[in-house]
Amino acid sequence: MKQTKTLKVRVKDKHAAQLNRMARSVNFVWNYLNELSARAIRERGLFLSTYDMHPYTKGAGKDLGLHSQTLQEIAREYATRRKQFKKTRLAWRKSGGVRRSLGWIPVNTGAAKWKNGQVFHNGCYFKVWDSYGLSQYKFRSGSFSEDARGRWYFNVVVEVDIQPNQAQGEVGIDLGLTDTA
């Protein structure tokens, strides 16, 4: 029987500068989609779906240093959160300052792979502290995320085989009858 599980592994600190650049680009795309969506609602009274946003971001990945599937994931996440919170406009993702947003880089299924003992995404290799043996898993969707101390993590959904519990042990029930006997 298979079950999905999310694994979180720490990315080595030497990749922080590159991941920060990518996170700034993600924030830029998020803010662009925020403005685009708010303008479409204001001018046409139309909520843009995930697929309506794709033509507006097509080709921007090369200039921003992001994978094309990352742009699609940002649009999907934006549309999901806008619908979840029932807002016409969501908060800006800030890249600098005291109240900046923590780094987040979404990864679509198939955009990240395990190669040569490292995570391969967007033409770059990222070394990680592999405590799970990631080579034995097939990656599904995931993300790179930053914590408050500036450390980066790679979060990925994988399928794992689980063994059903046979439950062959014995269970004893105390009925409390010794007090009444």
Language-model segments: residues:
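Nucleic-acid substrate recognition interfaces
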Residues: 1-181
